[in-house]
Amino acid sequence: MGLPPKTIVLDNGAYHIKAGFAGGKVVEIPNCLTRSKDGNRLFLGNELANCNDFTTLQFRRAHEKGYLVHWSTETAVWDLVMRNVGVMEPSMADYSLLLTQPVFTMPSIEHNTIQLVFEEFQFDAYLPCTPAELIPWDHGSFTMNQEDAYTGQHGECVLVIDSGYSFTHIIPVIDFSVQEQAVKRVDVGGKLLTNYLKEVISYRKYNMMEETYIVNEIKESVCYVSQNFKEDMEICHEKPRSKLEICYALPDYSTGKHGYIVRDINQKIEQQVLNLSNERFMIPELLFSPSDIEIREAGIPEAVMQSVTHFPENIQAMLLENVVTIGGNCKFPGFHKRLSSELRSLAPANWEVKVFEPSDPICFPWKKASHMPLEHWNANKITRSEYSEHGANIMTRKRRI
């Protein structure tokens, strides 16, 4: 039996919130407040879809460097989220909340969060956890649809690669518990990749340093992970035109609000056009080689191997046989093939390496939350009465998932 029927699962990402009733449908809402180009309009969350001009938008996000710090912004976004999932009551007293937080969330942030949950929204019960801790639940099917069939042999040992907006974490989960001593962080996330693409385009093509929204759309449309970086760089030097080069038509806001890839290079285009070649794979390459921009850290494959070395060899082998990727950066074409290839080259030859690719790595933790057993929820939740008795210090008295 899963979570209680009035439990809202809220995967509180720094870029997008994924929310909905456990076992129901998930909604994705931008976790930000956006100011329009002229400064006269503010868009909260998914109201941004009503914007007619995405140039020079200014974003105020509730998170800084991956952690929740702007409480007034988050309160406003959560109000919108509750309406979007179908809660119309002013009080949440009849509802429970399962909320995700990043690994290593500071106690001060946890205390402010629990105050927001019980004092501002008045939830009846609350359970915080990391997205990675939700992945092993319902190990038998590992997902809600056949596309995500999971056939790993050791569900008690899962290695989660969570690569999102702010950073990438390598998180071993054993017996449904994060092994914090072995968690590794790579300071490369979607925000850094978009900012780097802005710099590259602005230096080589047009000045787009203020066009975060547009450049992010370009990144998601054209970028991919190279399987052979040196070979692809050589291809990009082909004349007169590299087979990797594409044309991207920028939005002009008269014929459309969004840019698009020009499939026919002979087509007459009225909009400004970006020609992109090695930019397409240079940007995601930072996930595997942060040192390219002088970030002195290991890439994801090396960080995985550094993480598993904290365990005995038999556990290391089980973790590498159960690697699961979540987060928006995992959607780059070629990401899983490159990751599998590099892990295979780093692991001992007699170990099996399996990297499982959810069909929707962004919403996958949210979907897995619905399979948490009711007895586990009841044993670990924090109730409003407990909060009333102990205050925010209840966080130190209760064992988290």
UniProtKB/Swiss-Prot annotation:
Lineage top rank: taxon: Eukaryota
Record's GO cellular component terms: cytosol; nucleus; Swr1 complex
InterPro entries noted in UniProt: Actin, ATPase_NBD
One term of GO molecular function: nucleosome binding
SMART domains: ACTIN
CDD domains: ASKHA_NBD_Arp6
Quaternary state and interactors: Component of the SWR1 chromatin remodeling complex.
Protein name as annotated: Actin-like protein arp6
Species in which this protein is naturally found: Schizosaccharomyces pombe (strain 972 / ATCC 24843) (Fission yeast)
Name of the gene encoding the protein in the UniProt record: arp6
